[in-house]
């Protein structure tokens, strides 16, 4: 994969991640002045996950690292613009949720109940369910870690 293709893929990925970030920010009643920052943070988070995946990291660890990055940037922006970090981070993290894996797992459950047990369907169910669960766990833990690190009242040692 050439460098031009990687850059074009990254730009496309970041633009397409900014759109749902703004949409969910509007659903959550984020102030109008913060919408552009939600879009930018969603693009940064999804773009960083894409870069990590292109470099060879699996999607679970890439999502974890991207969520940590989103959390750190959100905390810094909340200090600059005097807003709660969740204003920026929650809407920005939603485009990284594993919708396709969860959908395939759900369809596999429906197929299992409708046509009966099949090893291929059960394998698709378990694989996609576990992948979706680990990605959601990585996103939630990764998003909460910067707050635990940066707002710690006691010394860590």
UniProtKB/Swiss-Prot annotation:
It is a multi-pass membrane protein. Keywords: Cell inner membrane, Cell membrane, Membrane, Transmembrane, Transmembrane helix, Transport. One of its GO terms (cellular component) is plasma membrane. It holds the Pfam family ThrE_2. It is found in: Cell inner membrane. Its main location: membrane. GO terms for biological process: succinate transport. The chain crosses the membrane at residues 6-26, 51-71, 87-107, 129-149. Involved in succinate export with YjjP. Both proteins are required for export. Belongs to the ThrE exporter (TC 2.A.79) family. NCBIfam families: PRK09917.1 (NF007391). The transporter is composed of YjjB and YjjP. This is Probable succinate transporter subunit YjjB.
């Amino acid at each position: 994969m050439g460098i031009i293709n990687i850059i074009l893929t990254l730009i496309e990925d970041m633009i397409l991640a900014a759109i749902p970030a703004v949409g969910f920010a509007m659903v959550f009643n984020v102030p109008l002045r913060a919408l552009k920052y939600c879009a930018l943070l969603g693009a940064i988070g999804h773009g960083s996950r894409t870069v990590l995946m292109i470099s060879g990291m699996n999607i679970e660890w890439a999502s974890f690292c991207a969520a940590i990055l989103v959390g750190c940037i959100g905390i810094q922006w909340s200090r600059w613009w005097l807003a709660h970090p969740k204003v920026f981070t929650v809407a920005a993290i939603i485009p990284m949720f594993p919708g396709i894996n969860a959908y395939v797992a759900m369809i596999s459950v429906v197929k299992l109940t409708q046509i009966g047990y099949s090893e291929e369907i059960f394998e698709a169910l378990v694989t996609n369910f576990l992948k979706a669960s680990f990605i959601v766990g990585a996103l939630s833990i990764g998003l909460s870690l910067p707050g635990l690190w940066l707002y710690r009242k006691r010394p860590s040692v």
